[in-house]
Every structure is written in C-alpha cells, then in structure tokens.
C-alpha cells in the first residue's frame, strides 16, 4: 500500500519513538524529510540525523531528551494533502507565543517561521513544533 502523506508518517514515527523512549528512529528518506530534519536539528529539537543507503535511502534521526523527558512536547502536521495551508509572510502563525516554531516550505527552501519572516517570504505551513 502506498503512503499518502510521507511527512505525517515521519512526524508520527518521531512521536511514537519518543513515547517509547527510543534513542534513534529510522524511516524512508526523501528530500523534504531531510530538509525538515535539518530544521529540527538547527532549532535544537533533535540531536542529529543521517541519511544512509544508495538504492533505498534511509533517514535515521537521533532523538533528544532533557532530564528523561523528550525535548519535543508537541509535533503537529498543519498542512495536509486534503487541505493545504499557504500563508503570506504577514499571516505566518506563531506557535505558543513564539516559544515553538512552525516549519514552512517556501520558494527559498524549508525554514522556520522566524526565518521566513526575516526573508520576507510566505509558503506552505508544513508542521508546528513545541
């Protein structure tokens, strides 16, 4: 069976692995997933990520914990295949008053809502992280 929403699958795998207190979670890789993992690492939500394999690339994400609790408290998919959410630079949402981040796919690449505001671009709001 084909996967309808690979990004939602990635976020669910991360949530499930954190609930099970796993240190690493693996999944099929794609360009979008690697870009989202890079943003999560840059923002300090994950410890690291690695892409392995040539024919069927696999993305391994090293999860991060603080005092035994996951660093990521909430990970939600915003835009989905059935209902895409595109926002202009002025309408980009702030997560929990600026404490969390929205990950946005723009014409300048995948970035946080703060970086998109600084660059003056809007785009598709992929997910929110807190």
UniProtKB/Swiss-Prot annotation:
Keywords carried by this UniProt record: Ribonucleoprotein, Ribosomal protein, RNA-binding, rRNA-binding
One BP term from GO: translation
Segments passing through the bilayer: none
GO annotations of cellular component type: ribonucleoprotein complex; ribosome
Pfam families, A to Z: Ribosomal_S8
Source organism, top-level taxon: Bacteria
Assembly with partners or alone: Part of the 30S ribosomal subunit. Contacts proteins S5 and S12.
Similarity remark: Belongs to the universal ribosomal protein uS8 family.
Alphabetized HAMAP family for the sequence: Ribosomal_uS8_B
Protein role: One of the primary rRNA binding proteins, it binds directly to 16S rRNA central domain where it helps coordinate assembly of the platform of the 30S subunit.
Listed name of the protein: Small ribosomal subunit protein uS8
Species of provenance: Pseudomonas putida (strain W619)
């Amino acid at each position: 069976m084909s996967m309808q929403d690979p990004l939602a699958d990635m976020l669910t795998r991360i949530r499930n692995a954190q609930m099970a207190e796993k240190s690493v979670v693996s999944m099929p890789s794609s360009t979008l997933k690697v870009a989202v993992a890079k943003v999560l690492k840059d923002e300090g939500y994950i410890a690291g990520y690695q892409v392995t394999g040539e024919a069927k690339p696999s993305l391994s994400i090293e999860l991060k914990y603080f005092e035994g609790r996951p660093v990521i408290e909430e990970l939600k998919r915003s835009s989905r295949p059935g209902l895409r959410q595109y926002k202009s630079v002025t309408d980009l949402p702030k997560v929990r008053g600026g404490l969390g981040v929205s990950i946005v796919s723009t014409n300048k690449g995948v970035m946080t809502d703060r970086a998109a505001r600084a660059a003056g671009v809007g785009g598709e709001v992929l997910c929110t992280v807190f």
